[in-house]
């Protein structure tokens, strides 16, 4: 399986005692525009719904799916395109991160998917 990093950051995967570094591809990173709208109030405090818009992608273009290829994108892009099985993002869940002594993120131990069958 080929991994192509469409983020602007190098992705470091800590797995099986080694570090796999995946540099960004030579393209503009893909960004998703978000919108918020108030859906209710709790004791006068607004409760906002965040909506991710596939129609308002900025930066680079999301490639079409290819056999044996996974694309690393931001979690927001991954969530907005939850119909795409070929999109993954670095798993930044606290149980999946590797940090240095100062708490800085060095990498992750896995990737995550937000794929949902429609």
Can you say where each PLM-predicted feature lies in the sequence?
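Intrinsically disordered, low-complexity segments enriched in small/polar residues
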Residues: 2, 6-118
């Amino acid at each position: 399986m080929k991994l192509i990093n469409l983020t602007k950051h190098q992705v470091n995967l800590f797995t099986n005692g080694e570090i796999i570094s995946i540099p960004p591809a030579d393209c503009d990173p893909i960004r998703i525009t978000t919108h918020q709208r108030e859906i209710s109030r709790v004791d006068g405090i607004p409760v906002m719904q965040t909506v991710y818009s596939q129609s308002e992608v900025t930066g680079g273009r999301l490639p079409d799916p290819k056999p044996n290829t996974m694309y690393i994108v931001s979690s927001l892009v991954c969530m907005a395109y939850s119909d795409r099985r070929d999109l993954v993002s670095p798993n930044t869940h606290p149980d999946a991160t590797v940090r240095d002594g100062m708490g800085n993120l060095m990498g992750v131990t896995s990737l995550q998917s937000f794929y949902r069958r429609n």
